[in-house]
């Protein structure tokens, strides 16, 4: 498979065309951003870590029958994925009160929820990716009610798999963001990435943070935190 011209560059990844009409080449960048791009930094090794961790987690999900766009890891920072039409919704699943939910509900960070909460955010940088209801989604016409139901069900299914998987590594899955895409055949599959960039991951005993909050809140060395997650997942750490 050959990498051809650049199709799209986002905050964390570059997407390239390949000679296959149904595959694209993804390159993970070393850039870190927070607060809708207001805080930016280049962090050497971050792209490699997110690629490694996403590869491990997508393979785990595929093992239990969850369909994803992941095809194969090509290098330390690159992977081949199926081409999909991204649904412009971020699907956030929360197991523990943290971040914006703590501020919105006035509840203490770290409060464990009796059951997961699934939220939808409209992907629009100019609007700041606002939280939207299912009624809003219908007005925006970005997904059908049937598709929203599938997104919710898949998010909850993925949540349970990841909760169990991270628990086996002594990590608490606090919350995480997913993105989904539609194949040419009309099937909804998991896309984008699952990494400490898109999850809140805390040590199950100390609540030490191993995710992008380390960068957001200036809590320490970001790559050290991501390396710890990779090591606990059984990947090859470069520390």
From Swiss-Prot:
Pathways involved: Purine metabolism; IMP biosynthesis via de novo pathway; 5-amino-1-(5-phospho-D-ribosyl)imidazole-4-carboxamide from 5-amino-1-(5-phospho-D-ribosyl)imidazole-4-carboxylate: step 1/2
Entry keywords, A to Z: ATP-binding, Ligase, Nucleotide-binding, Purine biosynthesis
Entry keyword 4Fe-4S: no
Keyword Ligase: yes
Catalytic activity: 5-amino-1-(5-phospho-D-ribosyl)imidazole-4-carboxylate + L-aspartate + ATP = (2S)-2-[5-amino-1-(5-phospho-beta-D-ribosyl)imidazole-4-carboxamido]succinate + ADP + phosphate + 2 H(+)
Family: Belongs to the SAICAR synthetase family.
NCBIfam families to which the protein is assigned, alphabetical: purC
The protein's name in its UniProt record: Phosphoribosylaminoimidazole-succinocarboxamide synthase
Chain's gene name: purC
């Amino acid at each position: 498979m050959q990498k051809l011209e650049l199709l799209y560059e986002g905050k964390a990844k570059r997407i390239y065309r390949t000679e296959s009409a149904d595959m694209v080449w993804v390159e993970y960048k070393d850039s870190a951003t927070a607060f809708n791009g207001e805080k930016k930094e280049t962090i050497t090794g971050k792209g490699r870590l997110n690629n490694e961790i996403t590869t491990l987690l997508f393979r785990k999900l595929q093992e239990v029958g969850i369909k994803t766009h992941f095809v194969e890891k090509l290098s330390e920072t690159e992977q081949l994925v199926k081409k999909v039409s991204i649904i412009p919704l971020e699907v956030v699943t929360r197991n523990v009160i943290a971040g914006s939910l703590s501020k919105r509900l006035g509840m203490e960070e770290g409060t464990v929820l009796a059951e997961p909460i699934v939220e939808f955010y409209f992907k629009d940088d100019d609007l700041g990716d606002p939280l939207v209801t299912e009624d809003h989604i219908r007005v925006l016409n970005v997904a059908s009610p049937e598709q929203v139901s599938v997104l919710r069900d898949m998010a909850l299914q993925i949540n349970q798999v990841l909760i169990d998987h991270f628990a086996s590594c002594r990590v608490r899955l606090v919350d995480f963001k997913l993105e989904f895409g539609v194949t040419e055949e009309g099937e909804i599959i998991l896309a984008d990435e699952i990494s400490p960039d898109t999850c809140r991951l805390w040590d199950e005993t100390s609540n030490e943070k191993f995710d992008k909050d380390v960068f957001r809140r200036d809590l320490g060395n970001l790559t050290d935190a991501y390396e710890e997650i990779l090591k606990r997942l059984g990947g090859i750490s470069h520390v």
